[in-house]
């Protein structure tokens, strides 16, 4: 049975459980965990692995040029950027309300970095994101709602 359990977990596509099974079994034996406590731990391991994989898939599907974060942004670079407004966008409330955001400004002002960073925040909040430069969107014939 010892070898059939990991095989069954993989067949059931429970790779998170399969990865942590041995460690969790030792932990359960050493700490006298109940069956329920043990089951909760390996289920949490599985959920963690699945959430990480889902996050990776969403980041890949977003087609970011680079993964950017708000923590990486140099706020001294462009002091005219309203930090409070950017962090408000990072809450993703505008998405929950079905609103659009259009970034305008000359090249080199931080638009792409901030856009990708907020996109990453949206992915972490569970939204599906697709990054595209404005020139590409307009060349495809799509127009933001604000311009319709």
What do these predicted ranges mean?
Residues 93, 102-129:
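Walker A/P-loop
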Residues 8, 60-82:
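Dynamic helix-loop-helix/coil hinge segments at AAA+ ATPase domain boundaries and subdomain interfaces
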